[in-house]
Amino acid sequence: HQLKCLRLPRLLAQWDEDLKAAAQQRFSHARLLTHVVEHEYRQRCENARQQRLRRARIPEPWVLETYPFSRQPKLNKKAIQALYDSSSYLTQNQNIIWLGPTGIGKTGLATSFLTHAIHQGKSGRYILFAQLIAELYQAIADHTQAKVLKHYLSYDVLQIDELGYAEVEPAQVGLFFTLMQQRHKKKPTL
């Protein structure tokens, strides 16, 4: 089928319904074409968003709208909401560091910002600090540092969770510092 060959899956699945709607609403040819293209475009955007979410490897998707601010009364909800809503951390390539003891919701907040960026069309990645350090250490052993750095530099937003909970070798610190230095003021890191 030509639509399958052209990679128009939504159109292939909905063609009969689109024609029926066009007949009922007396669409012109131009209106039918506009209708079909708009729906295909929306479906592709949604598919791309879902794919970016999968690739980000977020263990538990959070959104700020469901974050339990009532459990953390010391948090400045208005400031956090303003930063989130304005997306200035994305447009100004700002890093956000969440500090505090275990269990107060740092991961949830950071993940909500990463998810928000992905919904806005950005690529992103969630990774535990220990996992990142292990990959960097392996890259040193394999002499693939440039490739690994390029990989993590490619993400529009990078969320590094549980920073400081793992012991680190001096060589690993150096490569981690290089990664952070190269991302600084170019792409946000959470």
Task: Describe each PLM feature range.
Residues 44-99:
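Extended interfacial segments that mediate partner engagement and assembly in macromolecular machines
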Residues 164-188:
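Conserved catalytic/switch belt of AAA+ P-loop NTPases
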Residues 75-154:
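Conserved P-loop
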Residues 151-168:
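Conserved P-loop NTPase "ATPase switch" module shared by AAA+ and STAND
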Residues 122-123, 154-157, 184-190:
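Loop/turn-to-beta-strand initiation segments
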Residues 8-60:
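Interdomain "pre-motor" coupling segment immediately N-terminal to P-loop NTPase/helicase cores
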